[in-house]
From Swiss-Prot:
Protein name: Probable nicotinate-nucleotide adenylyltransferase
Domain of life of the source: Bacteria
GO biological process: NAD biosynthetic process
Metabolic or biological pathway, per its Swiss-Prot or TrEMBL entry: Cofactor biosynthesis; NAD(+) biosynthesis; deamido-NAD(+) from nicotinate D-ribonucleotide: step 1/1
Protein family per UniProt: Belongs to the NadD family.
Matching CDD domains: NMNAT
Signal peptide bounds: none
Lineage: Bacteria, Bacillati, Bacillota, Clostridia, Eubacteriales
Function summary: Catalyzes the reversible adenylation of nicotinate mononucleotide (NaMN) to nicotinic acid adenine dinucleotide (NaAD).
One MF annotation (Gene Ontology) recorded for this entry: ATP binding
Amino acid sequence: MKKKAIFGGTFNPIHNAHLNIAAKSIEKLQLDELIFVPSGNPPHKSEKGIAPAELRYEMVKEAIKDNCKFRIDDYEIKKKGISYTYETLEHFSRSQKDVDWFFIAGLDSLMDLDKWRNVNTILSLCKFIVFNRSGYNKSQVLEQKEYLEKKYINNIVFLDIKPIDISSTIIRQKIRENEYIGDLVPEKIYDIIKKNKLYV
């Protein structure tokens, strides 16, 4: 059985920390493939400040094209209406049989998971892989994991990846303040951002 992971997000923009997490996930989980799924209309974020979906898709496609185990899918971008994680997982599990599915998420997602739709469906369809993110208290995180595992299916796994302290929010702020971001994103992504005057 093949092992594949879904890495969803707005990728607004994709940056070096995203790529590091993806590469480390493949290595540590011994994945056959990792699929980047840029969101169309995410339920937990307003549209203000989010670059057009086609440009976010283009940036992810450019950033991952040199890694043969990375793939991009436009399912959420093409889907009309709000994108919910459980629907995305149902789509992939239906369209690709005999796959052991993983879903890559940050600690922020773990802390908010109880607010997501159909959590039991999500945890029944995949192993919910959580990577480190700065700014969270360890005991608080473990307490949340224990609470979720009692309430839902026990399918949450921590992945020990040393976090790179980069966020899309910081990058957008630096762009607005006319600061250099070339060390935070791949060169090709920096070029797309400049060419399309994104986040100014």
